[in-house]
Amino acid sequence: MNRNIAVVGLGYVGLPVAVTFGNKHKVIGFDINESRIKELKNNYDRTNEVTENKLKNTNIEYTSNAEDLKKADFIIIAVPTPIDKHNKPDLLPLLKASETVGKVITPDTIVVYESTVYPGATEEECVPVLEKYSGLVCGKDFFVGYSPERINPGDKVHTFETITKVVSGQTLEVLEIVADVYSSVVTAGVHKASSIKVAEAAKVIENTQRDVNIALMNELAIIFDKLDIDTNEVLKASGTKWNFLNFKPGLVGGHCIGVDPYYLTHKAQEVGHHPEVILAGRRINDNMAKYIASNVIKELLKQGLEVQGATVNVLGLTFKENCPDLRNTKVIHIIEELKEYGLNVTVNDVEADKNEAKKFFGLDLIDTKELKMVDVVLFAVPHKDYMENKKDYINLVKDCGIVFDIKGIINSDELNVSQRLWRL
């Protein structure tokens, strides 16, 4: 492999990609956030995806100067692809990154997109921007490929190197080059998709499939709750069959699973098909925070406790366990609902950045040692600390109080006799 690599976007996805390539090659790491560049130069990653030691031992030239990208002939773009308030794809970060690259791209460069998009977006949306700002012709002067990111934030087992990499290119020759570049660092190997659209579609259905399956579990949990059946016990029993899929109910947030299905449904509607199952799954999952909050109220009443002024400790704010990422977390909706009912809510998160919680949600996160006795403790996110010290947090629930368990980590025998357990 004889390519000069650059990675555009050094967040949860781009940084692990850059660091992994930097272990074997010299890499240019570009981000428009100058404070992020400064932190990385000081071997600090606020996402906790890459350790200080790994940052020290990788060969990356960090920069916020786009001119430095001229030194690269293999540019990987890994920027966020969110949705807007109407649940429509927001391609602005991707198009701005394409504009940045287009202004500095040199002939014979290959641009590979890793950002999750709907099928066709790379060639229909990104390529015209690259051509406009470069004055070059795609397929003649420069080329594109697509290799969807599969990073799982907080997961130290399934990493960039150990997950099979789907790769694609606009020609067979480009495909081979893209495969060769990624094969140099991805030990799990690569899968050569037959086209860029196939690779785009493969990525977007990975998370759509998961979203729909979790929605099914959430609907079952709602049904079983009305039937007074323990969902966890049902899943244990069903799980004894070899082909039963191991999905569990819960909140669906973050920048992938709760977002990507809308990219696919957008494209489906654009070509004249109204997707029913996918959108039904989205509705179920988006309503779970309201469902959980309403059950807090019901359980307080069952216990004979006053709703107005009832006290709650919410444990966990991030969108998933053992990860500081607050993007698109659904826990905030539970908190907002409880406050609307007049409850006094205290929020603790052992992983989240306090400044970001304040910036994004106006929340003041409380240190663990400052948590007080309350009517309700709600285990929202199963961070390692909460798992290992469950009893300490349960002991903060008053007699006749309630423990709410969103992820099925608490057993009834862990509670005091007068306390009540509600599990999703």
Swiss-Prot record:
GO biological process: capsule polysaccharide biosynthetic process
SUPFAM superfamilies to which the protein is assigned, alphabetical: 6-phosphogluconate dehydrogenase C-terminal domain-like, NAD(P)-binding Rossmann-fold domains, UDP-glucose/GDP-mannose dehydrogenase C-terminal domain
Keyword NAD attributed: yes
Keyword Oxidoreductase: yes
Pathway noted in the entry: Capsule biogenesis; capsule polysaccharide biosynthesis
Alphabetized GO MF terms: NAD binding; oxidoreductase activity, acting on the CH-CH group of donors, NAD or NADP as acceptor; oxidoreductase activity, acting on the CH-OH group of donors, NAD or NADP as acceptor
Chain's role: Required for the biosynthesis of type 1 capsular polysaccharide.
PANTHER family, A to Z: UDP-N-ACETYL-D-MANNOSAMINE DEHYDROGENASE (PTHR43491:SF2)
Name of the protein this chain belongs to: Protein CapL
Gene: capL
